[in-house]
């Protein structure tokens, strides 16, 4: 159980995280590769790396790390800030980059000499750990909506030679209507 002081810290941290995430919609997009505050959570790296910092649509990333950040930004734009898989996908991308750097005998250093990968990668990785933590809290506070019944497909089997014994691959028996027409739910409940 979380006690008073710890709960205050969690609430404050979540508030700061969400406020910084809102900044994303209020700032202008970047067309320039920059490297600022490379060893703190307020980092701005490339065109896409940093909380509330993002590149303009169609702008190419500055390097491989910026590409990971661009992919993360696109995922979060589609799925939402609390979608943890976006953050985990980012960490996998960064881990692959770290492996590539090791294989190059540390010859890969990124676009910035002032902020080499050796400084920037731990910073963005640490920031993403916070993102995963706060996304988990956000998902507890704002639970996901239950899934609605999915669409139903209706097929006239008189025209095909489909085997309907197992519900057309859905593991649900088809519901026969009007002779040879059947309907099967597209999002069957797990069996």
Swiss-Prot record:
GO terms for molecular function: metal ion binding; phospholipase A2 activity. The active site is at 72. Disulfide bonds join 29-56, 33-62, 38-115, 49-69, 68-93, 75-86. It catalyses: a 1,2-diacyl-sn-glycero-3-phosphocholine + H2O = a 1-acyl-sn-glycero-3-phosphocholine + a fatty acid + H(+). GO terms for cellular component: endoplasmic reticulum; extracellular region. One of its GO terms (biological process) is phospholipid metabolic process. Keywords: Calcium, Disulfide bond, Endoplasmic reticulum, Hydrolase, Lipid degradation, Lipid metabolism, Metal-binding, Secreted, Signal. Its main location: secreted. It is found in: Secreted; Endoplasmic reticulum. Residues 1-25 form the signal peptide. PA2 catalyzes the calcium-dependent hydrolysis of the 2-acyl groups in 3-sn-phosphoglycerides. Releases lysophospholipids (LPLs) and free fatty acids (FFAs) from membrane phospholipids in response to hormones and other external stimuli. Plays a role in pollen development and germination and tube growth. Belongs to the phospholipase A2 family. This is Phospholipase A2-delta. It comes from Arabidopsis thaliana. The gene is PLA2-DELTA.
């Amino acid at each position: 159980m979380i006690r008073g002081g710890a709960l205050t810290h969690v609430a404050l941290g979540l508030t700061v995280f969400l406020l910084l995430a809102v900044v994303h919609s209020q700032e202008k997009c970047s067309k320039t590769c920059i490297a600022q505050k490379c060893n703190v959570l307020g980092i701005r790296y490339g065109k896409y790396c940093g909380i509330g910092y993002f590149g303009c649509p169609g702008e190419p990333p500055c390097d491989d790390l910026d590409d990971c950040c661009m992919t993360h930004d696109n995922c979060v734009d589609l799925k939402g800030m609390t979608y943890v898989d976006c953050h985990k996908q980012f960490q996998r991308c960064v881990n692959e980059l770290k492996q590539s750097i090791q294989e190059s005998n540390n010859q890969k250093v990124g676009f910035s000499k002032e902020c080499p990968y050796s400084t920037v990668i731990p910073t963005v990785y640490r920031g993403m750990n916070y993102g995963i933590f706060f996304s988990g809290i956000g998902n507890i506070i704002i639970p996901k909506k239950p899934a609605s019944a999915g669409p139903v497909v209706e097929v006239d089997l008189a025209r095909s030679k489909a085997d309907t014994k197992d519900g057309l691959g859905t593991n649900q028996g088809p519901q026969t209507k009007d002779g040879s027409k059947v309907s099967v739910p597209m999002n069957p409940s797990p069996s």
